[in-house]
């Protein structure tokens, strides 16, 4: 007869064996997961893999300064600074690499020159006072440069240079206390940094260059296009006519706009900062108006913010009169067409002349909605009162779209976009409204009135519409 204690032993042994058997499979599963993630990253943007290969090539090239004896005899152990320079300054984009190279080179040159001056003053002060004078200079420059880093403009463009200045000044000035040939030390450090930075620039620019300005240009156009697609296509699906001629409202999702509202600001500012370091390339001339892209991006985010209260309205159970629904749908459609035309103008770097008709139609749709609300509409008084704030938001959204159009026009003038040729795509898509909605003209709208209590209070914008 087997007791309880004896019956537990085989169970423990089986569990132990299963645990021991699964030990090799766990690392393999993790490795497979990492491999899948690496493949996805490479497929998502093949430039990442190319950048990694470029970094490996550059590090190998500058390592020859240390491997080859003739080069090592001239530079000595300072040749290792070339490898360190490549590791810290080689960035994904050309603008990032140029910015770091210039920051490192100029900061090293300025700090080394000042450190030599500090050493000379320390020598003049006497042998016993020399360490104290050097320590005072190191303290003053470290405090000053660290504080200067907090300036917003310095933080954005020259923060890396400030760090290199502190490092170089401290190394050269302190080394002067123990090394007699401090000038040779500073010279070797500067030469190796120039060699490393030059190799980085050559590989970064000549082999599959990644331009931050081009990425910014495409990113801003993509955001405007996403917003236009949402307004024209997705919102159009929110208005579907049922068999009893009532307009049903589906619940749209604004998850596609999260990238515009949340992530775009930081990315645009980073790309614009890096693009400022880049020379003229391709269709982008020297001193291209990159800051104008930031203005367009801000206006795009403001327009996207207008959709949140409209989304709440579409998710509600309010059944507005058919006339108002048609006018809101018309404003959505024209806003989407306008934004898509503006995005196309940015992507192709052509003047946005084809967007002008849509902007005029958008203004007309907005005015029609205002006139329709002023004329009075039959329906539930509470529903109509809740629609008035939505109409105000619609007016603000129309204004945002017009501002985006003005900003894109300014960009086309500043960047000298080419005019559209006769072979260009000039076609205008038909307005996809319901036939009954299009037939509703302002001349056909009867003079209706809504019994609104005179004691009802409205906001300033709502009073303008009423």
Locate each region found by the language model.
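Extracellular/lumenal glycan-associated surfaces
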Residues: 91-92, 306-308, 400-402
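Long amphipathic all-alpha helical oligomerization modules
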Residues: 350-398, 412-466
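Intracellular, membrane-proximal regulatory regions of polytopic membrane proteins
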Residues: 1-36, 42, 180-191, 202-387
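Membrane-helix cytosolic exit motif
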Residues: 207, 403-413
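Aromatic- and histidine-enriched alpha-helix N-cap/loop-to-helix transition segments
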Residues: 56, 298, 302, 389-392, ...
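Alpha-helical transmembrane segments and their membrane-interface boundaries
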Residues: 1-189, 205-215, 449-466
